[in-house]
Amino acid sequence: TNVLFSLSKRDKKINKYFGLDFPNKVGVAGGLDKNANYFHVLGKLGFGFVEVGTITLKPQSGNPKPRIHRFSNEETIINSLGFNNVGSVKALENIERNKKNFSGILGVSIGKGKEISNERAHEDYLHLLDYFKDVADYYAINISSPNTNDLRLSLIHISEPTRQSL
């Protein structure tokens, strides 16, 4: 049963966005379940949607540790995880194994591999969009990694080919 959220019961209002019927408005963003190991459990806790990842085409170990830095004087924490994940093949296996136990909306956060140039990033994204097409209800294209040089600039190379593929 849903133990955390009273919102876990279907809202009386219709929560239909972009053709998807969300059970409720409370979800989990990418980063918590990087490898799609327990998204189905998060659904049982009452989340109406869960985003897994960020997932890259090939497995990545992420940045060297320590990856999380606390600055007490500024009351801040900075993460520089580096998209550590098991890669698309294993992540898809995990999703396929657990999706039958999940009734919410499943998002897949995708990112370019660190060995791929920004000019070729669209190739990774297009492959990942195609690879997860049968299991993802929506995608989040993660271009926010602050420790990947000029990743946001790769949006120029990503946007048109990605839009054309959809």
What is each of the regions a protein language model found here?
Residues K58-F102:
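A gly/proline- and charged-residue-enriched helix-loop-helix capping module
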Residues V26-G30, V50-V52, L106-I110, Y139-N142:
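Hydrophobic faces of well-ordered beta-strands that scaffold small-molecule active sites
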Residues I156-L166:
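Single conserved hydrophobic/aromatic residue that forms the stacking wall/gate
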Residues T54-K65, A140-S154:
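Glycine-rich, proline-tolerant flexible connector loops at the mouths of alpha/beta enzymes
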Residues S6-G27, L92-E96, F102:
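N-terminal amphipathic alpha-helix/helix-capping segment at the start of soluble metabolic enzymes
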Residues F22-K34, I110-D124:
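Active-site mouth loops of central-metabolism enzymes
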Residues L42-L57:
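Active-site cofactor/substrate anionic-group-binding motifs, chiefly glycine-
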Residues T1-N15, T76-N84, S88:
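An N-cap/entry alpha-helix motif that binds or orients negatively charged groups
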